[in-house]
A protein has these predicted regions:
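Short acidic-hydrophobic catalytic motif
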Residues: 1-33, 43, 49-59, 67-91, ...
Length: 178
């Protein structure tokens, strides 16, 4: 698709990922989940994951495919798509979003929240693959609306605290750009 014709929006549900060219704009809504965006500036190829947990916690069974619900497998699946397009992981730029605490005041003292674990896992995975992280918006309280313009490599993030007005997030969802 020619980007001059306009971009096509795709919305990721939890456990989904997408890799596409400049003709796409990828959106998602995150709470404690985390999204990793990858962008290759020269080819304007980009991808986004929306994972729920850092890893499966047990080995995959023989013949079992990669599962986008898990950060390690979601990143591996995205990197395989990039490699099929001739892009090596270290040629990409990464940004990380999400990991919010959705239930402040309901945590045990000293216990790491799932959002915190997800964000730390994303950082570690990208470091392991040698992919530079050029931006992040992690942790805090509440959810985030994320919009990734693959053509430009720009990612917009709007964080809304629990119980707050969601006006800014609603505007982003309707296509009102910052």
């Amino acid at each position: 698709m020619d980007a001059s014709e306009g971009q096509v929006d795709i919305f990721l549900q939890p456990g989904e990922l997408f890799v596409g060219d400049a003709g796409w704009r990828i959106r998602t809504l995150l709470g404690s989940c985390v999204s990793i965006t990858l962008w290759h500036p020269a080819s304007r190829l980009g991808g986004m994951s929306h994972f729920l947990l850092p890893s499966r916690g047990s080995p995959r069974l023989l013949g079992q495919g990669l599962d986008g619900r898990y950060g390690d497998e979601a990143l591996q699946a995205m990197l395989e798509d990039f490699e099929r397009a001739g892009v090596r992981p270290v040629q990409c730029q990464a940004k990380i979003f999400g990991g919010g605490n959705m239930f402040p005041g309901q945590s045990r003292a000293g216990a790491m929240q799932v959002g915190q674990r997800n964000g730390e896992a994303a950082r570690a995975l990208l470091c392991e693959y040698g992919i530079p992280v050029v931006g992040e918006s992690l942790f805090g309280f509440g959810h985030r609306q994320i919009i990734f313009d693959v053509d430009a490599g720009d990612v917009w993030s709007c964080q809304v605290a629990p119980g707050s007005s969601d006006t800014a997030s609603d505007e982003l969802a309707q296509g009102v750009w910052p």
